[in-house]
Amino acid sequence: MFRIGQGFDVHQLVEGRPLIIGGITIPYEKGLLGHSDADVLLHTIADACLGAVGEGDIGKHFPDTDPEFKDADSFKLLRHVWMIVKEKGYTLGNLDCTIIAQKPKMAPYIEDMRARIAEGLEAEISQINVKATTTEKLGFTGRAEGIAAQASVLLQKV
């Protein structure tokens, strides 16, 4: 049996915060605003995994009203989500992600992101795809006001 999930997330770029995407800190003058570390890609992946097993979304599991998750490491949140997936008897088929950002360029960091995500999902790097695109300077991502991400996951019953 297979299950498919999809995720989407957006965070605003602001000064005074580190930029963490896919579990990797990227040197940039701005970072993403959020209750946790605001890792837009890991949040998207967590949502896709939760959706695939019918467990809602990260807001349900890690509410932004709970002080326990203030500045939380999104990699730890992803690991918790993956434990839920495993408890339900699933393993990763593959994951395909897209980061939508005008700036900074993501290409130099994608392989490190793939490795970190594979670690979090107990998978091979070959099961993880991360790509990046711009919106050709259109919309909030095009104006570099924020970063968005999308993910599709295929889970397989063990």
From Swiss-Prot:
UniProt xrefs under PROSITE patterns: ISPF
One BP annotation, GO: terpenoid biosynthetic process
The record's free-text note on cofactor binding: Binds 1 divalent metal cation per subunit.
Transmembrane portions of the chain: none
Keywords: Isoprene biosynthesis, Lyase, Metal-binding
Record's catalysed reaction(s): 4-CDP-2-C-methyl-D-erythritol 2-phosphate = 2-C-methyl-D-erythritol 2,4-cyclic diphosphate + CMP
Binding site for a divalent metal cation: 9, 11, 43
Requisite cofactors: a divalent metal cation
Binding-site residues, 4-CDP-2-C-methyl-D-erythritol 2-phosphate: 9-11, 35-36, 57-59, 62-66, 101-107, 133-136, 140, 143
InterPro entries assigned: MECDP_synthase, MECDP_synthase_CS, MECDP_synthase_sf
Keyword Ribosomal protein among UniProt keywords: no
Keyword Lipid biosynthesis: no
CDD domains (UniProt xref): MECDP_synthase
Pathway assigned to this chain's UniProt record: Isoprenoid biosynthesis; isopentenyl diphosphate biosynthesis via DXP pathway; isopentenyl diphosphate from 1-deoxy-D-xylulose 5-phosphate: step 4/6
Record-listed E.C. numbers: 4.6.1.12
Family according to the record: Belongs to the IspF family.
Matches recorded under NCBIfam families: ispF
Subunit structure as annotated in this protein's UniProt entry: Homotrimer.
Record protein name field: 2-C-methyl-D-erythritol 2,4-cyclodiphosphate synthase
Recorded name of the encoding gene: ispF
